[in-house]
Amino acid sequence: MTQFLPPNLLALFAPRDPIPYLPPLEKLPHEKHHNQPYCGIAPYIREFEDPRDAPPPTRAETREERMERKRREKIERRQQEVETELKMWDPHNDPNAQGDAFKTLFVARVNYDTTESKLRREFEVYGPIKRIHMVYSKRSGKPRGYAFIEYEHERDMHSAYKHADGKKIDGRRVLVDVERGRTVKGWRPRRLGGGLGGTRRGGADVNIRHSGRDDTSRYDERPGPSPLPHRDRDRDRERERRERSRERDKERERRRSRSRDRRRRSRSRDKDERRRSRERSKDKDRDRKRRSSRSRERARRERERKEELRGGGGGGGGGSGGGGGGDMAEPSEAGDGAPDDGPPGELGPEGPDGPEEKGRDRDRERRRSHRSERERRRDRDRDRDREHKRGERGSERGRDEARGGGGSGQDNGLEGLGSDGRDMYMEAEGGDGYMAPENGYLMEAAPE
């Protein structure tokens, strides 16, 4: 395509001119020739010293030997200083040590932000405090992290010594001990090689990380050897964490238990309500069945009475004339009376003492003997209620007659009858051997 371009554009694509050749300024390395070549040292061996005449070499110390030497020199120098200061140290003549040493408590590992008033509030719970002395640095004026507390009574100091060790103040657990400088013979502070704990015995292999007072009296009640203080404190912290965790678990379990109890009570209430509803429905069904059973029983007794009257009605109907008129015939206990139909004066097919009548009597006696005690009690209660209502109704009629003089016309056609007539009307039997209906029930005639 470029060959079809015009010349002015083809000139833009033309190659550059080649670089002009210039001769090198010096020869190449392989072309150089040295005028003085290297040679050996054999001519100079006779000029060396004899190795047998040389002095022995001096041995220089290594880095490890130098560090060990400096450490040893430092320990020796520190021991000399401690011995010098120990000769001058007298705790009984210390101007900073004031008050009774047997009432003074030593508190270490105090937070640098803790004030004297805070210490007083924390340690006044064990007894009245006489004086608190917090130690500060003489050069910078900053707190050193320990203090001395003097109580008014020695028993309060012992109580604080026993119970305040390990107490957390401003986020740090303090160490509580007695003042040993003036109370323990031969006691030396830590700066003079004494003190408590094993954090400055030597290297990391012999030092312990946490230290505290060696109070073996706190472990007298426990069997076996007394544990180390820092391990005991760690165990106490772990025990506290476990107790707090158990308390939280118990609280959660209590909340779940209360929730379960509420759900259980709700389910129990629903269950009781359903059971009561079922019982009510069962009671209704039972009452309905009982009413239907009573109705069937009344119908059965009515049929039996009719059958008795129909079967044994020939014995006593001859003299009555069959029609009856105004007299009300009372059936006898044996069931003899005027039959409902048939000519008067005729006896039954077998007579009053036939085998059919005797069989009916046996069946009736058997049915009566098989009646349950509950039915008899119900019948007696019903009869008693009827008698009571009948007596109340009779007394009300008597009062009405006494007030109205017999002319009020409220006796429904019975005002012409006397008390005997009304009683006879109330006691009259029906045509089927039952008393007159009252309150919807047919009463069976009482046996004479």
Curated annotation (Swiss-Prot):
Principal location listed in the UniProt entry: nucleus
Modified residues (N-acetylthreonine): T2
GO cellular component, one term: U1 snRNP
PTM remark: Extensively phosphorylated on serine residues in the C-terminal region.
Keywords from the named record: Acetylation, Isopeptide bond, Nucleus, Phosphoprotein, Ribonucleoprotein, RNA-binding, Ubl conjugation
Ranges for region Required for interaction with U1 RNA: 92-202
Disulphide linkage map: none
Residues modified to N6-acetyllysine: K118
Protein location: Nucleus speckle; Nucleus, Nucleoplasm
GO-annotated molecular function: RNA binding; U1 snRNA binding; U1 snRNP binding
Crosslinked positions (Glycyl lysine isopeptide (Lys-Gly) (interchain with G-Cter in SUMO2)): K358
Modification Phosphoserine, positions: S226, S268, S332, S408, S419
SUPFAM superfamilies: RNA-binding domain, RBD (SSF54928)
Entry keyword Ubl conjugation: yes
Classification via Pfam families: RRM_1 (PF00076), U1snRNP70_N (PF12220)
Coiled-coil stretches noted in the UniProt entry, renumbered to this chain: none
GO biological process: cellular response to retinoic acid; cellular response to transforming growth factor beta stimulus; cellular response to tumor necrosis factor; mRNA splicing, via spliceosome; positive regulation of mRNA splicing, via spliceosome; regulation of RNA splicing
Role this protein plays: Component of the spliceosomal U1 snRNP, which is essential for recognition of the pre-mRNA 5' splice-site and the subsequent assembly of the spliceosome. SNRNP70 binds to the loop I region of U1-snRNA.
Name of this protein: U1 small nuclear ribonucleoprotein 70 kDa
